[in-house]
């Protein structure tokens, strides 16, 4: 449900993220056993079958899905800082997508003021999948028991 459809406005903006999938092999990505974070460059590396996904960046450029080659190269260059053997294999896929970001950096989770029966969970930014289990538990607790989650995450904090 778009916030304008229910007569309220949640202060958020899109944050564009990118990923580039590099095949595993002598001229490609290393064979990683587990996912890792390249903290210095904020790039996440996830082994997925026959390739490693290099993901990250946050670009505030409105609601557009134009892929910027420099952002994609940044992912590979970050990988090379930590994996010097990362070759020049062509990526098997490249992607960008928009993540909902709240204006204060915290997720927006809880009942929407003025709209009975509507609970929202948005604004997680780069941590959407990471925070999905705990967010789901919070929503389930709120709906089933009426116990509200932290005020810091409530949509009412913007009123």
Regions of interest found by a model, annotated:
Residues 108-159:
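C-terminal lid/capping helical subdomain adjacent to the catalytic/cofactor pocket in oxidative enzymes
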Residues 1-116:
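Active-site substrate-recognition segment that forms the wall
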């Amino acid at each position: 449900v778009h916030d304008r459809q229910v007569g309220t406005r949640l202060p958020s903006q899109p944050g564009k993220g990118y990923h580039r999938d590099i095949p595993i092999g002598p001229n490609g990505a290393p064979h990683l056993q587990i996912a890792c974070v390249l903290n210095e460059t904020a790039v996440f590396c996830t082994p997925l079958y026959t390739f490693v996904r290099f993901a990250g960046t946050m670009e505030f450029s409105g609601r557009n899905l134009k892929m910027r080659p420099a952002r994609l190269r940044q992912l590979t260059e970050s990988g090379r800082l930590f994996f010097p053997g990362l070759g020049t294999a062509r990526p098997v896929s490249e992607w960008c997508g928009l993540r909902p970001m709240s204006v204060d950096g915290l997720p927006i989770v809880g009942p929407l003021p003025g709209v009975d029966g509507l609970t929202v969970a948005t604004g997680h930014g780069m941590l959407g999948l990471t925070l999905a289990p705990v967010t789901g538990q919070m929503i389930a607790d709120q709906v089933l028991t009426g116990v509200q989650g932290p005020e810091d995450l409530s949509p009412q904090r913007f009123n």
